[in-house]
């Protein structure tokens, strides 16, 4: 019997807002605009694939 291995190709990213230093999780392939929950600055914008990040990546989670 052959087991199909499923690897996730996308990740969650912990990003830091450049304005208020708030850290929050963002999906790497976000399909909608992601805003900072504290100050409202745009952290990620969809591009049809991986999101365009406007914040610093602190950590990655699979």
Curated annotation (Swiss-Prot):
Lineage, top-rank taxon, reads Archaea
> What GO cellular-component annotations does this UniProt entry give?
ribonucleoprotein complex; ribosome
By its UniProt entry, which SUPFAM superfamilies does this protein fall under? Zn-binding ribosomal proteins
Recite the UniProt cofactor note for this protein.
Binds 1 zinc ion per subunit.
Molecular function via GO: structural constituent of ribosome; zinc ion binding
Mind listing the UniProt keywords for this protein, alphabetically?
Metal-binding, Ribonucleoprotein, Ribosomal protein, Zinc, Zinc-finger
Q: Which InterPro entries match?
A: Ribosomal_eS27 (IPR000592), Ribosomal_eS27_Zn-bd_dom_sf (IPR023407), Ribosomal_zn-bd (IPR011332)
Which metal ions or organic cofactors does this protein require, according to UniProt?
Answer: Zn(2+)
A single BP term in Gene Ontology: translation
ZnF regions (C4-type) run across 17-39
The UniProt annotation places Zn(2+) binding at 17, 20, 36, 39
Q: Identify the Pfam families for this entry.
A: Ribosomal_S27e (PF01667)
Family membership, please give it: Belongs to the eukaryotic ribosomal protein eS27 family.
Whom does it interact with, and what assembly results?
Part of the 30S ribosomal subunit.
UniProt-recorded name of the protein:
Small ribosomal subunit protein eS27
């Amino acid at each position: 019997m052959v087991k199909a291995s499923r690897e996730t190709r996308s990740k969650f990213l912990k990003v830091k807002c450049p304005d208020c230093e708030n850290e929050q999780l963002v999906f790497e392939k976000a399909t909608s605009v992601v805003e900072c929950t504290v100050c409202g600055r745009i952290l990620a914008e969809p591009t049809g694939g991986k999101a365009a990040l406007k914040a610093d990546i602190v950590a990655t989670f699979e």
